[in-house]
Swiss-Prot record:
Taxonomic placement: Eukaryota, Fungi, Dikarya, Ascomycota, Taphrinomycotina
Name of the molecule in the record: Uncharacterized protein wtf12
Organism encoding this protein: Schizosaccharomyces pombe (strain 972 / ATCC 24843) (Fission yeast)
Keyword Phosphoprotein: no
Comp. bias intervals (Basic and acidic residues): 18-37
Topology within the bilayer: Multi-pass membrane protein
Keywords: Endoplasmic reticulum, Membrane, Transmembrane, Transmembrane helix
Segments traversing the membrane: 83-105, 120-142
């Protein structure tokens, strides 16, 4: 049986396969000297090095909140029209709470004559007022973050943790390794003395 296989490779493809590392690619130019001890261990024409260079140079600070155009627009509107922004937030809060309130009131209203119905109605009014208050005080979208920052501050519990750690470590019968946290570095040989043998 005869095989009628025809190669799909052109003569240019075959020449590329036979190229040695000493030839010059006319599109890219001669390869510069590559120092593997430098910042990058990738060759200069590597596709990976091109992808790695897409990150901006000043990425040490991380992404900024103003990079999002929606945040910029909202901040600009808030700065230009502070009264309208507050009224708009109030309107959204009242509409959201009214939908929840009237839906729940429709479910609780038949039970209003019983003790359970009265308690449920007052709990419903209390929760509605609480939702309205939280919506007016906090920024939309940042509720969890804002509550934590307002309750414990921006620095978290740093001062309290520092005080507690100092009190624990200053006691005479305290072993410092028992109170290691994520900020404490313990060498591996101290954690596993058997590995030294």
């Amino acid at each position: 049986m005869k095989n009628n296989y025809t190669s799909l490779k052109s003569s240019v493809d075959e020449e590329d396969e036979l190229k040695t590392g000493h030839e010059i690619d006319l599109e890219k130019g001669p390869l510069p000297e590559h120092n593997s001890e430098g910042e990058s261990t990738l060759p200069p024409y590597s596709d990976i090095s091109k992808l790695a260079n897409l990150v901006p140079e000043d990425s040490s600070t991380g992404p900024t909140e103003t990079a999002n155009p929606n945040v910029e627009r909202r901040q600009e509107f808030k700065d230009l029209h502070p009264n309208i922004y507050s009224l708009l937030r109030l309107l959204i809060a009242v509409l959201a709470v009214s939908v929840v309130f009237f839906t729940a009131w429709g479910c609780v209203n038949p039970l209003e004559k019983s003790t359970f119905g009265k308690i449920a109605f007052f709990v419903l009014i209390g929760l509605t007022c609480l939702i309205l208050l939280i919506t007016m005080i906090l920024e939309p979208g940042l509720i969890g973050i804002s509550i934590m920052k307002r309750l414990i501050g921006d620095n978290g519990n740093d001062e309290r943790d520092y005080f507690v750690e100092n009190r624990l470590l200053s006691s005479p019968d305290c072993d410092a390794r028992q109170h290691a946290n994520s900020d404490t570095a313990i060498p591996l040989r101290e954690m596993n003395p058997e590995s030294e043998a």
